[in-house]
């Protein structure tokens, strides 16, 4: 006769094999967060940079079907339930896409772009920027000096095809 411990182990193993265990854990976390969330407490005002970053993360989470994580992000940050339009994000971030790159999150293309740029030469210098008086449109994007601009980030099939291959494995 099986013990309670044996039964628990079999159920846990079955749920893990079916890919349900992670979803259940995420759902429980989201429900606990929702129950503990104090809706009377105002959410912080997001800077333009934080809003764009959160939207990029939300798009990434949606693409990967991390819906519970996305719901926690939305609740915790005070993001609107309706995501910003992708064309608005690409315009604000000075991103140029091709048809293939439009099928993956912008964040994938940005990471792929900078990984390729890193292979082609020295790393881009990252400037410490105060978010109080800046938006993404006027943050210097030069490789090694503040006055040069590398131009728009080109998200092309080359920069996103690895993401497609990984996604469909």
From Swiss-Prot:
InterPro entries (alphabetical): FOP_dimerisation-dom_N, LisH
Record-level GO BP terms: cilium assembly; microtubule anchoring
Protein purpose: Involved in the biogenesis of cilia. Required for the recruitment of PLK1 to centrosomes and S phase progression.
Keywords carried by this UniProt record: Cell projection, Cilium biogenesis/degradation, Cytoplasm, Cytoskeleton
Record's compositionally biased regions (Polar residues): 151-160
Lineage start: Eukaryota, Metazoa, Chordata, Craniata, Vertebrata
Family statement drawn from the similarity comment of this UniProt entry: Belongs to the CEP43 family.
Gene Ontology annotations for the cellular component aspect, listed alphabetically: centriolar satellite; centrosome; ciliary basal body; cytoplasm; motile cilium
Ranges for region Disordered: 135-169
Subunit details: Homooligomer; probably required for localization to centrosomes.
Span of domain LisH: 49-81
Pfam families linked: FOP_dimer
Compartmental location: Cell projection, Cilium; Cytoplasm, Cytoskeleton, Cilium basal body; Cytoplasm, Cytoskeleton, Microtubule organizing center, Centrosome; Cytoplasmic granule
Descriptive protein name: Centrosomal protein 20
Region (Necessary and sufficient for homooligomerization and localization to centrosomes and pericentriolar satellites): 1-104
Primary localisation category: other
